């Protein structure tokens, strides 16, 4: 629903699982959202930017959330592909 200014208000906007692209329902209490902070390579401090991933409860139930997060982090070049071994 939009107000007169065109802003979205009072509307549930569901998230999607970053790994499977499934919609995470409102009653999926096992789902998680995790932020990876970007770090300045010279100072070693956080830059204030981060990458957000959402993992649905179905993936967590199967015990595959760690593999999914690692695969997504390699795809987004957060960790090196050499760590895949």
UniProtKB/Swiss-Prot annotation:
The keyword Ribonucleoprotein applies. Belongs to the eukaryotic ribosomal protein eS21 family. Gene3D superfamilies: 3.30.1230.20. GO terms for biological process: translation. The gene is RPS21. InterPro entries: Ribosomal_eS21, Ribosomal_eS21_CS, Ribosomal_eS21_sf. It holds the Pfam family Ribosomal_S21e. This is Small ribosomal subunit protein eS21. It comes from Branchiostoma belcheri (Amphioxus). It is found in: Cytoplasm, Cytosol; Cytoplasm; Rough endoplasmic reticulum. One of its GO terms (molecular function) is structural constituent of ribosome. Component of the 40S small ribosomal subunit. One of its GO terms (cellular component) is rough endoplasmic reticulum.
